[in-house]
Amino acid sequence: MLANEVAAAAGEPLPHIMTKTFMDTFVFMGGAGTGISLAGALILFGKTQASRKIGIFSLVPGLFNINEVLLFGLPIVLNPLMLIPFLLTPVLLAAISYVAVAAGLVPGTNVATEWTTPILLNGYLSTGSLSGSALQLANLVVGVLIYAPFVLIANKIKVKQINDAFRSLLRRSCATADSSRRCLDHNDDAGSLARSLITDLEYDY
């Protein structure tokens, strides 16, 4: 990045396209895995209240490239389904951004910015052009489109888990007179659902 800054100050062509600032600005928007795109996909395509809330709660820190809410709240960690777009999105956005800079559509990064600089602002500051921010917006949309089908698949899996838990809970509650206590003691999805229902009832009344 220093070589680019020196070249820009001297009015010479930038020697490097791929720099740390390039990756922070155009690829890792919202943190690793382009988390801001995942947050957008959750807000737009999430079918459960929990997934939409995670998307909303992660949006503000995501603007500053902080994505721990998504990593451990969704979660992405140890989630094979979300690991695919988590790895694929940065690779594709890096390629798109490289081509855009190489073709002269967007200036190269010639000013180092901190990784926590807000999205869109860092696109302008690092390139000295609004086209840098425009490329970020384009990458954001592409990232949302990549994450969208995986979010939809996750929705179906979650809904099926909830439905299965309801059926299991219903069978157990109708089995014997003292089954309600045993339902609460189970450590599976049905037990978790039973405890959630009890908590909601206690909260409401």
Model-derived features with residue positions:
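Transmembrane alpha-helical segments and their short flanking loops
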Residues: 3-20, 71-185
